Every structure is written in C-alpha cells, then in structure tokens.
C-alpha cells in the first residue's frame, strides 16, 4: 500500500517533509520513513516502537494531505492513543513538523522501557472489567475504553496472561495484543513520561527555532475531541509536551 501511495505527489511530499524534519533534530533516527513505507528495509523493522509509531503517524498525515489535495477536509476529528497526534494535525492543532516530532520522541522514549508488559482486548465495558481487575493489586489497568462493550487492559505480563486464562474459562472474549512487550497506557509508562516530556519540549523548541514550524503552517481549525480530556475544549496554544505525556500514560477515553 505504501509503495502505491508514495506515487502520489501530495503523499510523497508529506513523507519527505517528515524525514527532513527528523533529520534536523539533535536526536535523529538512523533510518528514513520513505524506506519503511516503500519496503526498502528489514521486514521486522516496523515492529520497533520508534519506527512503528513514527511511520504510522507519518502515513496518517500523508493521507490527510492527500485528501486535502482533493479538497476533502474533515469537519471534526477524533484520535485513539498515538493516533491523536495525526488527529491534532488534521484538525489544525499541530503543524506537520510538530506532529512528526511528537511521534518520533514518543516511540524513541518507550524503547527505554525495561518492564515486561502486555495488553489484552476484552469484550466487556469498563465497569465489568474493573471487577476482574480488583483481584490483581494494581498490576493491570484499563488502558482504553473503545466502546460500551470493548475495553483494552494493560499491565504486567504475568498478571495479564493470568487474567486472559480466567476470562477464557468463563467464556468471556479476550485477545492478547502484539505490542512487543509494551503495556501502553499503564503504570509501565509512568516512569517514561517525564523523560518524554522533557525531550519533546526540547525537540519542539528546536524545530521552531530553525524555522520548520510556526502556527501559520497549521490547517484551518476544526473540532477535535480529545480522548485524554473528552469533555474539555483544548487550547491549541497550550497543547504542549505535557499533554502528550498524559496521552502516553493515561487511559484512552474513546467511548
């Protein structure tokens, strides 16, 4: 799919600009997004968080630009987990440079995680899920409320696997997710949050100082519903690194 999309001028320009922004950072990747998108890389490269999160955001932004080149723009936007970065871009809350920088430092920071974590999708609402979690002494948390009957849980691998066995015995739908040992939106991410916030703040300051980002480069603003603070109207000028720190560690309130 990527090799086909890259043939479109608007999509390719978005990918190449993202690569250019990342190459300007003091802490930069040793790979290029365009190589990942076109398959010019090792097959398992996309499984690394710093690559998968960065490339996923770049592709999402490329699709936003592609649709915009056809005069197709959203009237409102919502994002899920790291998908909020591209959602903020599409809704005019972030520039392209701010968005790809946010994604890169998120992925790069979580590679420092040393805890063994897992995530579990379950076919129940958060209230019912909490009843099961009460027996696990804080080792598992609700990571995402996806719909009234779909919740994602996250935490210590041993506890998550045990819960999966319990749910299976009770006939409750559950599925372990492939996250490369990461327990996103759980206590595993809390120790990484401050480092992510500090590094991202420096990165955003850098791209602004070198002229790669200013507010005039944002899309016209449309409604964006935050899945961190779904009942708040966010001020784009206050959408700083602290927000993305919360996005990494807090539950996704998608529903």
Features from the language model and the residues they span:
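Acyltransferase
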Residues: 17, 23-29, 36-255
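Short, surface-exposed "cap/lid" segments of acyl-processing enzymes
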Residues: 1-13, 17-18
């Amino acid at each position: 799919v990527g090799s086909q999309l890259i043939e479109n001028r608007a999509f390719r320009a978005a990918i190449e600009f993202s690569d250019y922004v990342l190459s300007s950072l003091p802490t930069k990747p040793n790979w290029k997004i365009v190589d990942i998108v076109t398959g010019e890389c090792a097959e398992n490269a996309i499984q690394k968080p710093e690559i998968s999160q960065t490339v996923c955001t770049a592709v999402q932004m490329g699709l936003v630009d592609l649709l915009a080149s056809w005069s197709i723009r959203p009237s409102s936007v919502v994002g899920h987990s790291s998908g909020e970065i591209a959602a903020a871009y599409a809704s005019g809350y972030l520039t392209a440079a701010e968005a790809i920088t946010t994604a890169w430092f998120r992925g790069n920071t979580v590679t420092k995680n040393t805890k063994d974590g897992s995530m579990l999708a379950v076919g129940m609402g958060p209230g019912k899920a909490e009843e099961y979690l009460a027996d696990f002494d804080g080792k598992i948390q609700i990571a995402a409320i996806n719909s009234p009957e779909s919740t994602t849980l996250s935490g210590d691998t041993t506890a998550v696997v045990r819960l999966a066995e319990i749910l299976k015995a009770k006939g409750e739908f559950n599925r372990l997710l492939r996250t490369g040992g990461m327990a996103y939106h759980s206590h595993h991410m809390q120790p990484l949050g401050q480092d992510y916030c500090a590094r991202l703040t420096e990165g955003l300051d850098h791209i602004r100082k070198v002229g790669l980002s200013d507010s005039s480069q944002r899309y016209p603003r449309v409604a964006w519903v935050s899945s961190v603070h779904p009942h708040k109207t966010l001020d784009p000028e206050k959408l700083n690194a602290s927000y993305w720190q919360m996005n990494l560690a807090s539950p996704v309130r998608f529903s």
